[in-house]
C-alpha cells in the first residue's frame, strides 16, 4: 500500500511539473524582428531655380552641385544631388542638353538601359507617364530588393533632358526601408509635378 501511495505522489508531482512548465509566455519562442521607430520631418517645400529648370523640394533636404562623375569632372554644371541626410539617401539629378533627335533618342535609351539594370533583382516595375505644361517624361517604380526603387526622366523634347535616381547609402532591406522609401517618394513626386523648364 505504501508503494502505491508513493507512486501516486510521484505521478502527481510529475503531472504538476508538466502543467506548471507550460505557460503562454514561452521564452523559447523567437519574437518577430522589429525596426527602430522613425521620426519623419515636417514637410515644407522651397523653390530651386538653376540652369534651365526649377522645381520645389523639401526643406529637410539639402541640394548641392555635383562636382565629380566617378573619377572625373561632372560633364556639365547642371548636375545636382539632393541629400536626404536623416535617411542616408541621395536623389541624383543629371541634366543633359541636346540638339538633335539622335541625341534625344540616345538619352531616352540610356535611361531605359539604366533602369533595366535593376531587373535582375527586381520583382516588378511600374512605368508612370508624366505630362506637365513644359515637360513630359516617365516615372519608374521598381519593386523588390533593388539599389534604386525610384527613377525618372523629364524632357521638353527639343533641347533639355533631366534624369533622377534615388539611392540609399546602406544595405538594401525592403522591409526596413519601405516606409522611408514611400515618404521620400511622395517628395520626389512633388518635385516632378512642380518641375518647369525655364529656357
Which residues does each predicted region cover?
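C-terminal motif of bacterial Sec signal peptides marking the signal peptidase cleavage site
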Residues: 18-21
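Bacterial signal peptide processing site
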Residues: 23-26
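Short, well-structured beta-strand
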Residues: 28, 122-199
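Extracytoplasmic/periplasmic, Sec-exported soluble proteins
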Residues: 45, 49, 53, 99, ...
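Secretory pathway targeting signatures of secreted, lumenal, and periplasmic proteins
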Residues: 48-109
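Short secondary-structure junctions
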Residues: 59-71, 115-129
Amino acid at each position: 500500500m505504501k508503494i502505491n501511495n508513493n507512486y501516486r505522489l510521484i505521478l502527481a508531482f510529475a503531472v504538476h511539473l508538466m502543467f506548471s512548465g507550460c505557460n503562454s509566455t514561452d521564452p523559447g519562442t523567437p519574437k518577430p524582428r522589429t525596426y527602430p521607430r522613425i521620426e519623419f520631418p515636417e514637410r515644407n517645400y522651397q523653390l530651386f531655380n538653376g540652369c534651365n529648370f526649377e522645381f520645389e523640394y523639401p526643406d529637410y533636404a539639402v541640394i548641392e552641385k555635383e562636382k565629380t562623375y566617378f573619377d572625373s569632372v561632372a560633364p556639365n554644371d547642371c548636375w545636382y544631388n539632393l541629400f536626404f541626410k536623416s535617411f542616408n539617401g541621395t536623389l541624383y539629378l543629371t541634366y543633359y542638353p541636346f540638339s538633335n533627335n539622335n541625341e534625344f533618342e540616345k538619352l531616352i535609351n540610356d535611361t531605359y538601359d539604366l533602369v533595366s539594370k535593376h531587373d535582375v533583382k527586381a520583382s516588378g516595375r511600374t512605368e508612370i507617364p508624366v505630362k506637365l505644361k513644359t515637360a513630359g517624361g516617365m516615372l519608374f517604380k521598381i519593386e523588390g530588393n533593388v539599389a534604386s526603387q525610384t527613377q525618372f526622366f523629364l524632357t521638353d523634347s527639343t533641347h533639355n533632358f533631366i534624369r533622377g535616381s534615388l539611392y540609399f547609402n546602406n544595405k538594401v532591406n525592403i522591409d526596413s526601408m519601405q516606409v522611408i522609401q514611400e515618404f521620400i517618394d511622395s517628395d520626389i513626386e512633388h518635385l516632378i509635378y512642380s518641375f518647369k523648364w525655364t529656357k
